[in-house]
Amino acid sequence: MNRIRPMRATTICSIVASGIFLLASTQSQAAEKDIHSSPPASFKKVSTLVKLPDYLPGMGTLYVDPKTLPVGPFLGYDRAGHLVNVIYMVPLKEMDEHKAFTNLGSVAAGLKINHTDIEFNAGHPGVEEPHYHVTEWLISHADHEKRMK
């Protein structure tokens, strides 16, 4: 009879530990799923912050946490409202000064990147100085060409 009690305690501990693991895993998946269909609460639509259209062909509808400007990350959503890219806008001046950019994009941690594009931009509303767009795409290049017009 003493042998049964330790087994039951072990079983109960295993069940509780499994439940905690599943809860944490489910919450992590829910948070990740949420960012795929809508940005975090601290992110604002870029078109409400600067004079830009709601949808930018080739980039999508962009959202950014204003505290992270000018670098971002900017979250880009396609016309159907799906997250398709994460963009950083890195000013040339800061690169020339050898500034370190650390822990960028923790809001997007765990996303599966398909490919990365790096493109020069001479400046636009919101980031007027010359900078590079570092775009981490979550969709293939072919999908990018097709969906982001």
Residue ranges and their predicted role:
Residues A30-K149:
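Metal-centered catalytic cores of metalloenzymes
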Residues N2-I15:
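Bacterial N-terminal signal peptides that target proteins for export
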Residues C13-A24:
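Bacterial N-terminal signal peptides
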